[in-house]
């Protein structure tokens, strides 16, 4: 089995020609008084998506991901926010430029909520050393998960109003490999139909994108062997 150095993980906007599904209003949560709970009072704590995924098999994780067309917002490489109607494609790309795993979700799904299922899919297919992710994936839970799989997590730190923690020099050099994810996203959209959807619905959109990824992978494979 070939050993891959780095897997770059990223989510990219997929614009669709369909109306976004109206989101249902969340159920009103019961409000509690401030302060400590009374003696004998039990307050339910809502589990985060990543915490729930840690206890689920892969099939359940993937099935639970929202897949309807809706509206998404994402910061681009320059720090500006872009919004779109459609979906979001989440990719794991090897440092040779070949996509290894892909999942398509609603546009509004946060990148970090797809990291665990993507990582498990990729771990079944290839052996690699480093997981490279941007600040959207900054989470101690995801770092710990990466280590449990035997990988070294290199995740850009999100200061969230605090002080940013930079990479060590050798980590920063390795993290530069993550530009491969952006190049693959760009090639899929510019050269392999990712920007030109003529179909509607999650299943058909995913099929369209997978044909593009298949062609991209074949071309990249030939480039590596010329």
Residue spans for each PLM region:
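Short glycine-rich loop/turn motifs that provide flexible caps or phosphate-binding loops at active sites
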Residues: 85, 96, 181, 200, ...
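Charge-patterned, long linear interaction tracts outside catalytic cores
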Residues: 200-226
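Polybasic low-complexity intrinsically disordered regions
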Residues: 1-135, 140-148
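Helix-centered, glycine/charged polyanion-binding patches within enzymatic domains
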Residues: 30, 135-203
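Catalytic-loop motifs flanking and including active-site residues across diverse enzymes
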Residues: 114, 180, 184, 207-210
């Amino acid at each position: 089995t070939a050993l891959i150095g780095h897997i770059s993980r990223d989510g990219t906007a997929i614009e669709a020609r369909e109306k976004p599904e109206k989101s249902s209003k969340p159920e009103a949560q019961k409000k509690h008084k401030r302060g400590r709970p009374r003696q004998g009072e039990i307050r339910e704590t809502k589990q985060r998506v990543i915490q729930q995924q840690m206890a689920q098999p892969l099939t359940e994780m993937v099935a639970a991901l929202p897949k309807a067309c809706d509206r998404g917002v994402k910061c681009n490489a320059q720090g500006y926010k872009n919004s779109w109607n459609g979906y979001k494609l989440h990719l794991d790309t090897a440092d040779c430029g070949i996509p290894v795993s892909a999942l398509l979700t609603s546009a509004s799904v946060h990148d970090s909520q797809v990291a665990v299922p993507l990582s498990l899919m990729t771990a079944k297919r290839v052996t690699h050393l480093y997981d490279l992710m941007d600040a959207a994936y900054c989470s101690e839970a995801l770092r710990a998960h990466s280590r449990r799989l035997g990988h070294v997590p290199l995740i850009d730190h999100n200061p969230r109003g605090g002080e940013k923690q930079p990479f060590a020099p050798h980590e920063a050099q390795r993290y530069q490999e993550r530009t491969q994810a952006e190049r693959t996203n760009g090639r899929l959209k510019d050269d392999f139909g990712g920007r030109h959807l003529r179909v509607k619905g999650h299943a058909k959109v995913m099929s369209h994108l997978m044909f593009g990824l298949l062609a991209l992978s074949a071309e990249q494979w030939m480039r590596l062997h010329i």
